[in-house]
Amino acid sequence: MPRAHDDNWDLASSVGATATMVAAGRALATKDPRGLINDPFAEPLVRAVGLDFFTKLIDGELDIATTGNLSPGRAQAMIDGIAVRTKYFDDYFRTATDGGVRQVVILAAGLDARAYRLPWPAGTVVYEIDQPQVIDFKTTTLAGIGAKPTAIRRTVYIDLRADWPAALQAAGLDSTAPTAWLAEGMLIYLPPDPRTGCSTTAPNSVLRAARSLPNLSRALWISTQAGYEKWRIRFASTAWTSTWRRWCIPANAATSSTTCAPRAGTLRAQCGPTYSGAMVCPFPPHTTTIRSAKSSSSAVV
C-alpha cells in the first residue's frame, strides 16, 4: 500500500519488515540444494534485525505454510519467487557491466547485499539509496562479520519521498556515464510524486523494476510447478526495462498492465479439478511509457 507522507519505520516494522522478509527468503533460498542463488549475507542480516518470526523461519523452526495459512506449494512458491527475482536482477547487473556500465543505482536498497556479494568489475560504483538508519544498520552488521564491498560503495542517506535525485547527484553520480538502475519491490510503497521525480542519466542507461501482478499468490504457485527455469522465463516477461536519454520512473509503473484473455482451462489443468474460476493471465504484455522533459518513448516488455 502507498506510504503516508509522515510515517516512520525500521527494519522490524512497517515497510522495513518487508525488507527483512525478503532477506529471509534469500537466506532460505541460499540453503536450497538447487543452488540458484548464493547470498551469504542474508542470514546474518536477518539475525541482526532480531525479529523472532524470521529468525525461527531461517532456522527451520517455523512452518511458513502453517503459520501463513498457505498450502505447502504456495509457501515454497513464495521462497522460490524471491530466489528467482534475486537471480534475475543479479544477471541483469552482470549483463550491464559486461556491456561496459560502471555505475549502478539501487533504489531503497534495504538489506540488499549486492554491493558485497556480486563480482563487480574494477572501478564499478554502486550507489545505495535508503534511510540513514537502514544503511547504517547494514553497514555495521556486515562490517562486524568482516564483509567488505566488492565495488566502490557509496551510500545516499535519504527517504525516497524526499528529493533523492538531488541527493544522488550530490553523492557523486556521474550524469554523463551510462547507469544501471534497480527498483526492486519498492514502487508500490511510494505515493505518485516520488515515482515521477526525474533524474538526468546518460544514453545507454537501463532500468529494471518488478511490478505488481494480479492474483500474485496463485500466479507464483502455478509458475513454479515446472521448475525454476520456466519461472525465470515467465518472470522476465513481467519485469520492464528501457533505454533512454532522460529518465523518469513512470507514475503508473506499479499498477498499469494490459490483460489478456482468461485461461481458466489451462489453470484448471494445472491446479486440479477443484479449480473452477477464471483468472486473468498473470503474465500479459506490458507497455511502459518513459516520460522526460525532452522526449517520450515506450517499450513493450
UniProtKB/Swiss-Prot annotation:
NCBIfam families in UniProt: mthyl_TIGR00027 (TIGR00027)
Keyword match ATP-binding: no
Coiled-coil region: none
UniProt function note: Exhibits S-adenosyl-L-methionine-dependent methyltransferase activity.
Protein name according to UniProt: Putative S-adenosyl-L-methionine-dependent methyltransferase MRA_0733
Top-rank taxon, per record: Bacteria
Any one of the GO BP annotations: methylation
Organism of origin: Mycobacterium tuberculosis (strain ATCC 25177 / H37Ra)
GO molecular-function term, one example from the UniProt record: methyltransferase activity
Residues reported to bind S-adenosyl-L-methionine: D130, D159, L160
Keyword S-adenosyl-L-methionine: yes
Gene3D superfamilies with a match to the protein in the record: Vaccinia Virus protein VP39
Known EC number: 2.1.1.-
Family: Belongs to the UPF0677 family.
Pfam families, per database record: LCM (PF04072)
Keywords of the record: Methyltransferase, S-adenosyl-L-methionine, Transferase
